[in-house]
Amino acid sequence: SMTDGLFTFMFWALGKGFSKNEWSQNSDYYLSGGSPRYNIYETKDKRYLAVAPIEDRFWNKFCEVIDLDITYKGQKKTDQEIIEKVTSIIKTKTSGYWDKVFQKADCCCTVVKSLKEAVGDDHFISRNLFSKKVKINDETALPSLPLPISKQFLSPKIIKSFPKLGEQNKTYMK
């Protein structure tokens, strides 16, 4: 099932669970929301910033950009206190404001794109991620779902149609 593939993204939590019998809870590990340096923060306009300034040089730049009080930059506060402070700062400005600021700052931080923004992003367009089509009817063809499969296993760029409802029943319902 699709769920089986999700475990790949939980490598950190699975490693800790299997090796030390320490099973993760929500936001309790460094790479799962337990650190202010690797987290997701909500903006004033209810969008989100993906923040990953793990290395000190990126963290220091991030703190400078958001104007985080010096007492929160070091180890004088707990991670939870720093997360709460960063959350309160990020919520004061819109995603548009933060997007402009973080495009200029090298600190591993970006506004989380909407699905519409993501499919229109140059990164995906230049790689033809949505170029394959599925024929819906004589007039309509829609982009097929991209699959994480090596290009060598994909068919050429031909528009294919999907089976009509019930068309494959005899084949698969024996």
Q: Residues of each region from the PLM?
A:
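Active-site-adjacent "lid/gating" segments in soluble enzymes
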Residues: 1-53
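Beta-rich nucleic-acid/ligand-interaction surfaces
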Residues: 6, 78, 117-121
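Short, surface-exposed loop/helix-turn segments at secondary-structure junctions
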Residues: 16-27, 121-136
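Short, acidic/polar N-cap/turn motifs at the starts of alpha helices
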Residues: 38-40, 131, 148
